[in-house]
């Protein structure tokens, strides 16, 4: 595993997240930035996923259950070469393929249309069960927000996965402790996740969601588990990489203005030349 290469991918992905949301003047940057390291490791070190097999069912599949983090998924697809980087600037525009929430009918590499929180987990369970019935050895991964876990459907799906002993399923909890209304513990407080998933018959691993080595080890361990699904509880920082967004619930679903965008790009060590490279011109009043 080349840590420096992964860091470069993650930096590119975070930069593109900022470009998408800023250019659209809409979107969800906080959770997208926070989960970038998780998906960087997953897509570049773990999953059987390439530009060539993106349109095939004969590969590992991923369900972004927290569908509002679509800027992250689109940035991943661009980094993998599935779509052109320039298309990211059509995010949330009229007639775009890059809608505010992922649509499997629009792009290869999107395995489930998501957005209504909690439903993606059930879809992932169904895919894993179908793979077993089809004698398909490919794995199913799903990313769940900690705020999303306030949805009862998450736990119904978790119970079903444990019952069917779906060892080809790996769920990742993006535990950043924040949601649109503030701290998750002040809203409903779905944590602690470890004890709850174990009670439903899951193998559970807790990791730092920004530690590439720990993430890779967790995904590798999940592949060895037999007779039960795996839940990776990844502790993350919402808005990771952008100084004024880190650990701020207010950046859950808000776009930065032009000045803030410049600061964010500088934080990501890319600078304004990235913005100019794609000839983006946008003036936003503070």
Feature-to-residue mapping (PLM):
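Cofactor-binding active-site loop characterized by glycine-rich and histidine/acidic residues
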Residues: 17-21, 32-163
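Glycine/aspartate-rich loop-and-adjacent alpha/beta segment that forms the canonical ThDP
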Residues: 212-286
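N-terminal capping segment at the start of a domain
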Residues: 9-26, 174-176
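Short secondary-structure boundary/capping segments
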Residues: 80, 187, 246-250
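Thiamine diphosphate
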Residues: 109, 113-116, 121-225
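Non-catalytic, mobile gating and regulatory segments of ester bond hydrolases
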Residues: 1-5
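Structured core elements
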Residues: 63, 170, 206, 231-233
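Glycine-rich beta-alpha junction loops
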Residues: 68-69, 73, 176-177, 211, ...
């Amino acid at each position: 595993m080349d840590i420096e290469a992964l860091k470069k991918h993650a930096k590119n992905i975070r930069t593109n997240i900022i470009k998408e949301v800023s250019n659209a003047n809409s979107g969800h940057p906080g959770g997208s930035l926070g989960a970038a390291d998780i998906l960087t490791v997953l897509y570049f070190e773990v999953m059987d996923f390439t530009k060539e097999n993106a349109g095939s069912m004969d590969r590992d599949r991923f369900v972004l259950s927290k569908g509002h983090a679509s800027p992250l998924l689109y940035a991943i697809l661009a980094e993998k070469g599935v779509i052109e980087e320039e298309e990211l600037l059509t995010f949330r525009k009229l007639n775009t393929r890059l809608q505010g929430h992922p649509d499997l009918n629009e792009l290869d590499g999107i395995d489930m249309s998501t957005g209504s929180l909690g439903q993606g987990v059930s879809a992932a369970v169904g895919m894993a069960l179908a793979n077993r019935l089809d004698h398909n050895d490919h794995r199913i991964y799903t990313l769940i927000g900690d705020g999303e876990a306030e949805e009862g459907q998450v736990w119904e799906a978790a119970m079903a996965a444990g019952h069917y002993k779906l060892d080809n399923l790996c769920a990742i909890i993006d535990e950043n402790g924040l949601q649109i209304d503030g701290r998750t513990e002040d809203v409903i407080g779905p944590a602690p996740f470890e004890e709850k998933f174990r009670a439903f018959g899951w193998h559970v691993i807790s990791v730092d969601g920004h530690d590439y080595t720990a993430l890779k080890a967790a995904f590798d361990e999940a592949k060895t588990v037999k007779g039960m699904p795996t839940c990776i509880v990844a502790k993350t920082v919402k808005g990771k990489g952008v100084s004024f967004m880190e650990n701020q619930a207010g950046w859950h679903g808000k776009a930065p203005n032009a000045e803030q965008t410049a600061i964010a790009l500088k934080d990501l060590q890319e600078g304004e030349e990235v913005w100019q490279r794609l000839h983006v011109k946008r003036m936003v009043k503070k």
